[in-house]
């Protein structure tokens, strides 16, 4: 394979084919063609995937106005690097947007803080050029004191974590066909991201970061952990970049800023996400699996109605080492 196949239409033809073309496997197979060509990922150290701690500023208060344009309505998410706010665009009547806050580590040196700001603006510029139906559109970015902001479309709907919890509370599973439909849309978004120059990695794919709109469209949200892969510079790290969520994080993403990731790392996280959607429970962490491989329970043990092909595809996407995937 010399270049990835692209598009939901291509995927829809392949999904009914052999095991290597089902949802998670197809996406990881495609991603392998865009993997970093500077060398194989090395074995990382077992660091904390959430990185170091620093003082987080309190959330902005409702009715705060930023850039004389955006009025904060409410906080809709909060993490270790800042908050996400539902906001009103005062220049465009009736438009609501999401403000993604990325705080500067004030414990770092002035030079490091300036480098972080410069990196934020370079990468935010790339994100603003992205245009895909399964990604929220980034329309603006700016700095306000020790806070940087991305302005994105506000995506209405329910995240897939809530959909899984709803099914679980009823003693049911989300239908396999439905999950594969979502997977097709996610694959299309990831192939688009990974095909950029340089490739854009999401690095925090999980059910809570995937929205299902009232129209049935999947949106991969929360660009706050994005990393750009710059050729010959594996150190390209940004204040935008986080470490991911341990349950969905591949082994190569551990080790702090020294962890080596490429598009196949996103595919692992997609596989782990599909595992959760299909079984009603997240998979064992990669670090635990490295020490005790049997900790990963086969999906069909938890949900016997799953097809063997889908189970094998999910497990393939969750291979412990990226090089285990055939190119």
Predicted segments with their positions:
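Protein kinase glycine-rich loop
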Residues: 73-80, 84
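Conserved N-lobe loop of protein kinases adjacent to the ATP-binding glycine-rich P-loop
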Residues: 88-97
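AlphaC helix of the eukaryotic protein kinase fold
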Residues: 103-129
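Activation-segment/catalytic-loop signature of the eukaryotic protein kinase fold
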Residues: 141
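Conserved short submotifs of the Hanks-type protein kinase catalytic core
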Residues: 145-159, 163
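Activation segment signature within eukaryotic-like protein kinase domains
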Residues: 182-183
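Protein kinase catalytic-loop region centered on the HRD/HxD motif
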Residues: 188-200
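C-terminal lobe helix-coil module of Hanks-type protein kinase domains
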Residues: 247-327
């Amino acid at each position: 394979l010399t270049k990835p196949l692209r598009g939901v239409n291509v995927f829809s033809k392949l999904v009914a084919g052999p095991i290597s073309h089902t949802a998670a496997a197809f996406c990881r197979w495609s991603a392998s063609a865009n993997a970093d060509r500077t060398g194989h990922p090395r074995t990382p150290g077992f660091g904390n995937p959430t990185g170091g701690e620093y003082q987080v500023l309190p959330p902005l208060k409702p009715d705060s106005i930023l850039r004389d344009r955006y009025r904060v309505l409410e906080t809709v998410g909060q993490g270790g690097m800042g908050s996400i706010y539902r906001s009103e665009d005062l220049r465009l009547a009736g438009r609501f947007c999401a403000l993604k806050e990325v705080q500067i580590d004030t414990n770092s040196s002035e030079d490091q803080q300036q480098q972080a700001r410069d990196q934020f603006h370079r990468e935010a510029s790339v994100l603003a050029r992205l245009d895909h139906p399964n990604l929220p559109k980034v329309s603006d970015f700016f700095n306000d004191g020790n806070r940087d902001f991305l302005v994105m479309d506000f995506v209405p709907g329910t995240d897939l974590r809530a959909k899984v919890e709803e099914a679980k509370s009823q003693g049911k599973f989300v239908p396999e066909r439905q999950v594969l439909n979502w997977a097709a849309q996610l694959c299309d978004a990831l192939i688009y991201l990974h095909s950029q120059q340089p490739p854009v990695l999401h690095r925090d794919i999980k059910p809570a970061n995937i929205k299902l709109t009232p129209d049935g469209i999947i949106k991969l949200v929360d660009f706050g952990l994005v990393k750009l892969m710059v050729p010959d510079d594996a150190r390209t790290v940004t204040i935008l970049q986080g470490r991911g969520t341990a349950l969905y994080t591949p082994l190569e993403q551990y080790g702090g800023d020294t962890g080596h990731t490429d598009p196949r790392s996103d595919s692992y996280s997609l596989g782990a996400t599909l595992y959760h959607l299909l079984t009603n429970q997240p998979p064992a962490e990669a670090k635990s699996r490295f020490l005790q491989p049997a900790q990963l329970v086969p999906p069909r043990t938890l949900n016997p109605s799953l097809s063997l092909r889908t189970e094998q595809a999910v497990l393939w996407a969750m291979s412990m080492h990226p090089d285990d995937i055939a190119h």
